[in-house]
Amino acid sequence: MQGDLAALKRRLKELGSCVVAFSGGADSAFLLDCAREVLGDKVSAVTVFAPYTLKRDIRRAGGIAEALQVPHLNVDIPLPDALRYNPRNRCYICKNEMFALARKEASRVGAGHVLDGTVADDDEALRPGMKALKEQEVLSPLYECGFSKEDVIDQLNKRGREAWIHSPDSCLLTRLPFDREVIAEELTRIEMAEEYLLSGGVDPVRVRSDGTTARIEAGRDCRRLFFSEEGMNEIAAQLKKFGFRHVSLDLEGYRPGSVDD
């Protein structure tokens, strides 16, 4: 798959002005970079910060927007009632809320469109949030112009934006089983545990939680970092300080969606 950069720039020029729903991920970062290049001061970004949003994503989004000198609105929201018990359609509910807020920002600044960073190899069957895109009339120029995730990484490298490339993240709700109450303190200790493990070179990593037990999923190339008695004792002790009673390592390593296996 090969994204058409010229077509993307033409499409952005046609749109005239926009607000980018900006997660800080590589895809939306590349889109924001291109939009800034084509539209200049007629582009802005909005990032929604909920209790289940990773703070590292918020920091990353703010840094990129600042580097591009793009006006950037952070919208801090409480946990929506519809997400309190982590329903199976959580992605749709979250995206619908996020895009509605982005539309409000677009209306406030007089921008004609809301854009997001969906790419051509995002599987619609696995991305229920894509339903919200259609309902909220959000446009996905990278998708329209055939950009895959690999294309985005290639373009970021060509632009000298290597620092914007990182392991894919997902919100903290994905660390919890479906249909169980979301507790703020549990989200906090999950994020603290992941930040600790990332600081030790474990990337990607997910800390799945059932309330009292942390199940660590490490990238397959990182699993070897755990296999020493001293290292395992240190990790277990630190995660217990964060509030977990039990700590385990998933020997199969990181795999998306495994919390519901």
Show which residues each predicted segment covers.
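A short interface-forming secondary-structure element
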Residues: G211, R215-S228
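Short, low-order "capping/linker" segments at domain edges
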Residues: G257-D261
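Mid-to-C-terminal catalytic subdomains of enzymes
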Residues: Y143, F147-K149, I153-L197, P204-V205
